[in-house]
């Protein structure tokens, strides 16, 4: 039996999805926007320096979309990410969890090499 050496080819399934915005997160944001009474609001997710691990996530509502923003719409909710933050969030999942510890938005980020105990700070 002859073995033929083949060059390793990258598996296209290993390429991370640009970003996952779960139904749970989109539905919670939709509820919060309705409570604010301003249908023009969009959720802006960003990364900034700080926290115990070097970077931290931030969430805010914004009416404006900037030229360099990446936008994603799910369940009628628009998510905005600026170009600097996007590079740190490629492949991440933005979710909303409710459990005995409380309710919070959670980012599962494959780019983070370490995260702190609070889950809002990370390093790459």
Swiss-Prot record:
Q: What is the similarity comment for this entry?
A: Belongs to the HesB/IscA family.
Task: Write out the residues that bind iron-sulfur cluster.
Answer: 52, 116, 118
Give GO MF terms, alphabetically.
2 iron, 2 sulfur cluster binding; 4 iron, 4 sulfur cluster binding; iron ion binding
Q: Which cofactor does it need?
A: iron-sulfur cluster
According to its UniProt entry, this protein's organism is: Ralstonia nicotianae (strain ATCC BAA-1114 / GMI1000) (Ralstonia solanacearum)
Q: What would be one Pfam family of this protein?
A: Fe-S_biosyn
Classification from the root reads:
Bacteria, Pseudomonadati, Pseudomonadota, Betaproteobacteria, Burkholderiales
GO BP terms, alphabetized = iron-sulfur cluster assembly
List keywords of the entry alphabetically. Answer: Iron, Iron-sulfur, Metal-binding
Q: Which Gene3D superfamilies match?
A: HesB-like domain
Complex and partners: Homodimer.
Q: Does the keyword Transmembrane apply?
A: no
Instruction: Give the signal peptide range.
Output: none
The note on the cofactor says: Binds 1 iron-sulfur cluster per subunit.
Biological function: Required for insertion of 4Fe-4S clusters.
InterPro entries for the chain: FeS_biogenesis (IPR000361), FeS_cluster_insertion (IPR016092), FeS_cluster_insertion_CS (IPR017870), FeS_cluster_insertion_RrpA (IPR023063), HesB-like_dom_sf (IPR035903)
Coiled-coil regions in this chain?
Answer: none
Q: What is this protein called?
A: Putative iron-sulfur cluster insertion protein ErpA
């Amino acid at each position: 039996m002859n073995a033929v050496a083949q060059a390793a080819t990258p598996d296209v399934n290993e390429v991370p999805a640009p970003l996952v915005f779960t139904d749970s997160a989109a539905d919670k944001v939709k509820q919060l926007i309705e409570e604010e009474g301003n249908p023009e609001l969009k959720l802006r997710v960003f990364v900034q320096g700080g926290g115990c691990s070097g970077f931290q996530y931030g969430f805010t509502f914004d009416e404006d979309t900037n030229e360099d923003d990446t936008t994603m719409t799910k369940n009628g909710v628009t998510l905005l990410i600026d170009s600097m933050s996007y590079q740190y969030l490629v492949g991440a999942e933005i979710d909303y969890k409710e459990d005995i510890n409380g309710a919070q938005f959670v980012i599962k980020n494959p780019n983070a090499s370490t995260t702190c105990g609070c889950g809002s700070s990370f390093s790459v």
